[in-house]
Amino acid sequence: AIVLGVLVGIPLGAICAQYANRLPDHLGRMLSLAGHSMPIFWLGIVGLLVFYAQLGWVGGPGRLDVAYRYSVPAVTHLMLIDTLIAGEWDAFRNAFSHLVLPASLLGLVALGYVARMTRSFLLWQLRQDYTTVLRLKGMSESAIVWRHALRNAAGPILSIIALTYAYLLEGAVLTETVFAWPGLGMYI
């Protein structure tokens, strides 16, 4: 989930900063605000209703369907790894389909926070004197954002990623409860 949030959130925040107060910025801010402000348990319930009950695109609650639950021996107690060890490819696909929605929702929460903060840090960098000098030298706005401002904002962005990881551990408890997933939330 943190990988999804970082791989999508940082470029989304950079695009929002590059096109500040224009359509891509407004759309990106709406997506990041939705991911950051909506409760994770509500997103989980809506995701289950839409993508599992109505569309049937993902697996439902639990780690596996009942048909596969007892066919896979528990070696590591991590279903994806246990199904690979057992060579049960259908069970692997089933376990992966059960993992997609919870991981995506946690990734959406991480994406929202990382994108908002990346945009904020980059807008601050774009107001600095060195970006004015780069503009006067004729460098394009995208080159300034992606080559210079993003590099200078990397320190605060890495700090936010670490804080997001801690925030996701908190959200994992609710996500695991909604999706009946016995994970790290049982131990916290």
Language model region names:
Residues 57, 64-66, 138, 146-147:
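Short, surface-exposed linear patches
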